[in-house]
């Protein structure tokens, strides 16, 4: 972190520049990220990002291990009822235990899972891999 300004007689605020690698934090990919004619993030209405029916599913995964269709099939009845699903892999433990593994070898949603979800769950608007911040990690997947 680099300090840009600090509070003094001339500057009434403090600010920093933070540098972090992409995929270390929160972001969303719209369908245009993977589908040539899909909507871009700025074309989606704000309501698309608001969800009342949300689930946290436990899908344990290791280093660079994909979440597959087979991992999600046991949750079919639940997925049919929600508009957003978080997938808890247990990988958040590496955030403090081994930050390099956390940053570079995280689990991912495999093509088979993406196709399965898009083909079978039209009400599902989003899927995310649950990576809680450090202070919250002890409460995840319990």
From Swiss-Prot:
It is a single-pass membrane protein. One of its GO terms (biological process) is L-tryptophan catabolic process to kynurenine. GO terms for molecular function: arylformamidase activity. One of its GO terms (cellular component) is membrane. Pfam families: Cyclase. The chain crosses the membrane at residues 75-91. It is found in: Membrane. Keywords: Membrane, Transmembrane, Transmembrane helix. This is Uncharacterized protein HI_1016. It comes from Haemophilus influenzae (strain ATCC 51907 / DSM 11121 / KW20 / Rd). The lineage of its organism: Bacteria, Pseudomonadati, Pseudomonadota, Gammaproteobacteria, Pasteurellales.
């Amino acid at each position: 972190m680099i300090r840009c300004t600090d509070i003094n007689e001339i500057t009434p605020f403090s600010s920093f520049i933070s540098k972090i690698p992409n995929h270390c934090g929160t972001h969303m990919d719209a369908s245009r990220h993977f589908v040539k004619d899909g909507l871009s993030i700025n074309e989606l209405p704000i309501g698309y990002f608001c969800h009342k029916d949300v689930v946290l599913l436990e899908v344990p995964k290791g280093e660079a291990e994909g979440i597959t269709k087979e991992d999600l099939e046991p949750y079919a009845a639940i997925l049919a009822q929600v508009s957003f699903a978080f997938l808890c892999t247990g990988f958040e433990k590496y955030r403090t235990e081994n930050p390099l593994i956390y940053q570079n070898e995280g689990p991912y949603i495999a093509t088979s899972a993406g196709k399965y979800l898009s083909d079978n769950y039209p009400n599902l608007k989003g899927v995310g891999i649950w990576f809680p911040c450090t202070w919250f990690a002890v409460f995840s997947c319990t």
